[in-house]
From Swiss-Prot:
A GO CC annotation given for this chain: membrane
Amino acids binding a divalent metal cation: 230, 232, 245
Organism, as annotated: Macaca fascicularis (Crab-eating macaque)
EC number from the UniProt entry: 3.1.-.-
Protein topology in the membrane: Multi-pass membrane protein
Similarity remark: Belongs to the glycerophosphoryl diester phosphodiesterase family.
Lineage, uppermost ranks: Eukaryota, Metazoa, Chordata, Craniata, Vertebrata
Cytoplasmic side, ranges: 1-17, 61-69, 129-162, 490-627
Positions in the Extracellular compartment: 39, 91-107, 184-468
Residues annotated as transmembrane: 18-38, 40-60, 70-90, 108-128, 163-183, 469-489
Compartment annotation: Membrane
GO molecular function: glycerophosphodiester phosphodiesterase activity; metal ion binding
Designated name of the protein: Glycerophosphodiester phosphodiesterase domain-containing protein 4
Any Pfam family hit: GDPD
């Protein structure tokens, strides 16, 4: 905001530097310094914000170093102080910023639409990811009904985030699309309605081409086609009207070299004999004292000419204006107390003007003091008023006003135009302000930058309503298409990711079920799988015949609900006397650890039964439930 405000008020840079000079006595481009500082602070803050967004994008936790914290405080502190000063002592700058929107609002609209389209890319990514997260959570929710309420709360929060991000963006975008309906710009009009180019009054001559209020400056203004010449008039102690703007001689003369103790005195307290000896041009050649930062470099001839300038009298200016037939308008500075012309300074100036024999209609009489006397002595003068009501102007028979542009545009410009009152505004140096005055049908402007404004043949930022409507609709349609395309692209990409996730989840579930079944199958191996070739069933197959009738220990038969009582029909086996055989292995679940390969032996099952001699092996028809 500060940077925007300072850029748009570039027309006031000289006045800002001049006010600081009055307080400090030191000339410096403070306005450019503040502009540079605001630009650096804005760039630093923007880069820091961009870096933070990129880190958040990558999922990296933010950590602000102490140096950055200090710098941020240093950014905020001067901005707050400067904004307070502007709001307290320089409220007119806000008026300038408002006027700039009358010119730049159509272009701000087009740029804002483009920026919103660019910003929609991350917004679309975020909204699409939230949608994918919602769907994935819903998919998971079907597998866990116990947590349904909690999941619903999470989904509601995700939907809320979507609305919180997407809805404001859409509202802002729609507002920008409809913004031209509320835009008023004087430079959007038909070509046939455009008024003539305002005439130019050289403010103190041409202060960008020569030392202000010197004959060189006025001659430069005439060379660049000035319609009139503007100046400020003081009266010396010996009654000679001379040209000087400031209320002391420090800035534009060498008074500090001649009489340092008199540097702060009012110029009207000096005699003309002394004032005529002062140099009024050497300061202009010094680089550190140039009044405008954007001045063109002077040629050697102009530098030499500027060094020899002195304070001119009002009679000198009237002679030039009479010769070139240029209008003259001036501010008349009243003498200080105890001055000989304290109450008659207006009559003295009128007598000097009449003595110059200049055509009276070339004088734009601006001072309001003793206007009745002026009308009686010089009826041909064109009286100029200030920013007062139309009724007051009509009562005083005034048809011209000279006003500050910052106060004119917000205060009834149409009323003055309707009353056929000619308007001169001051001081306009920027092309965009001159274009605004041109499109507003202002009659004349007072300017320091006559070299640039005299070259303009057409107002900047001018366009017809049909052309602007075409650009408006074209940009809106293209931006909507881009936004829809971006949203569809990210939506489709997140949908593909969601389908891949569902597919992988299904495969994972199927695979996990298969693994569980396989684990269960391994845990319940049938008898023939885990049976060792040294078991009874392997050695005596007859014992395992008729599986339906003889359910073994490892035969997985469904247990009957009713238990069959076990009959003691098995004859106990008795070992034979001479029947000594190696122990027969039987199947158990505990495996012995296999010996090392160096022993070259194999793992064997533990045996628990001794060698038995069986005459007639029989199996009872017993059905034992599986434990």
């Amino acid at each position: 905001m500060l940077l925007f405000l300072w850029i748009e008020t570039s027309n006031e840079y000289f006045n800002f530097d001049w006010v600081i000079f009055l307080g400090t006595g030191y000339w410096f481009y403070w306005s450019i310094f503040i502009l540079s500082l605001a630009g650096i602070l804005t760039a630093y803050s923007s880069l820091l914000l961009l870096l933070g967004l990129l880190l958040l994008w990558e999922g990296i936790e933010l950590y602000l170093h102490l140096c950055h914290k200090i710098l941020i405080l240093l950014v905020i502190l001067p901005c707050v102080i400067l904004m307070f000063i502007i709001c307290k002592f320089w409220k007119e700058r806000w008026l300038v910023a408002g006027l700039s929107l009358q010119i730049f609002a159509p272009y701000v609209h087009l740029v804002s639409i483009t920026v919103m389209v660019i910003l929609f890319w991350p917004v679309a990514i975020y909204v699409a990811r939230l949608e994918r997260e919602v769907r994935m959570r819903r998919y998971r929710m079907t597998h866990s009904e116990k947590k349904r309420l909690k999941k619903c709360n999470v989904i509601a929060r995700l939907r809320g985030l979507q609305v919180a991000v997407g809805l404001p963006f859409l509202l802002i975008f729609l507002s920008l699309c409809l913004m031209p309906l509320g835009i008023y710009s004087p430079c959007i009009q038909e070509k046939e309605n455009l008024g003539p180019k305002p005439t130019l009054f050289g403010h103190r001559g041409a202060p960008m081409l020569g030392p202000e209020n010197t004959m060189m400056s006025f001659e430069k203004a005439v060379e660049h086609g000035a319609h009139g010449l503007e100046t400020d008039v003081h009266l010396s102690y010996d009654r000679v009207p001379f040209l000087m703007h400031d209320f002391d001689l420090r800035r534009t003369t060498n008074i500090r070299e001649v009489q340092p103790e008199s540097a702060f005195k009012n110029p009207a307290t000096f005699s003309w004999d002394f004032l005529s000896t002062l140099n009024a041009g050497k300061w202009f050649v010094k680089p550190e004292l140039k009044p405008f930062y954007n001045m063109k470099p002077l040629s050697k001839a102009d530098k030499e000419r500027a060094r020899n300038q002195s304070i001119p009298t009002l009679a000198d200016l009237l002679t030039l204006a009479k010769k070139e037939r240029k209008f003259v308008i001036f501010d008349l500075r009243g003498p200080p107390p105890r001055h000989p012309l304290r109450h008659t300074f207006v009559r003295q100036v009128v007598s000097v003007i009449l003595a110059s024999k200049i055509e009276q209609h070339l004088i734009f009489w601006l001072p309001a003091h003793d206007r009745r006397y002026v009308r009686s002595m010089a009826p041909g003068f064109q009286h100029v008023g200030h920013l007062v009501s139309v009724k007051t102007l009509a009562k005083n028979n005034i048809s011209i006003i000279n006003v500050d542009y910052k106060k004119l545009f917000p205060n009834g410009l149409r009323d003055y135009k309707a009353a056929n009152i000619r308007i001169n505004v001051y001081t306009i140096n920027e092309p965009w302000l001159f274009s605004l005055a041109w499109c507003s049908r202002i009659n004349s402007v007072t300017t320091d930058n006559i070299g640039l404004l005299s070259q303009l043949n057409h107002p900047h930022f001018f366009m017809t309503p049909k052309f602007y409507m075409f650009i408006w609709l074209l940009v809106d349609i293209i931006s909507v298409l881009f936004i829809v395309a971006i949203f569809c692209f990210h939506w489709r990409r997140e949908t593909i990711k969601e389908k891949l996730f569902e597919t992988s989840s299904t495969l994972t579930d199927t695979q996990s079920r298969s693994e569980n079944e396989e684990d269960l199958h391994i845990a319940m191996k049938p008898a023939r799988v885990v049976e060792s070739p040294w078991t009874l069933a392997a050695l005596y197959p007859a014992l395992s015949k008729s599986g339906k009738e003889h359910q073994g220990r490892f035969n997985f038969a469904a247990p009957s609900k009713k238990l069959v009582p076990i009959k003691n029909a098995v004859t106990p086996l008795k070992p034979g006397k001479h029947d000594i055989q190696p122990p027969m292995p039987t199947t158990v679940f505990e495996l012995t650890q296999a010996p090392s390969r160096q022993a070259k032996s194999k793992a064997t099952f533990q045996t628990t039964l001794p060698t038995l001699k069986v005459d007639k092996p029989t199996m009872p028809s017993v059905e034992v439930p599986y434990p």
